[in-house]
Amino acid sequence: AYARLVGVPVAELDDVVFARYPLAVRINNDYYARSIQRVNDDLSLSFYCAVENGIVLTAMHTVSILDELDQTLSDIEQRLGPAWVTLGCDCCLRRQEIEADGTVDQASALLRRHSVVGFNTYGEQFNGMHINQTMTGVAIGRRQRSRR
């Protein structure tokens, strides 16, 4: 069913396809990615995080990962002032997507421009839930004090 949904033959389902066509679970008004790990021999799917039997998953569409990241970091800098440093924890599945898109150099330049340092993770915990395909971080700004 997933292969038909995304228009890709089962034999061609791989990490790149899984990253480009994620599934998500809806909780209240928010969607949380449920990243596919592999296609099993019986054609069922295994996920990187818990997916209970009977849970409804929604097909999601991705946007430009770099455009979205640049906008988010710019918004944070608008609120905090220029970032001194941001410690970023980026899901390894995002890294795979960037590599597949051939945009590693552009991603590195964007992260340097916004003073981001960090590492790749295997997802994050949020409110007790394991989520994937996300970037979390701590931004430390350097807002100037006003003189009195």
Q: At which residue positions do the language-model features occur?
A:
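Small-residue-enriched flexible segments
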Residues: 1-114, 121-148
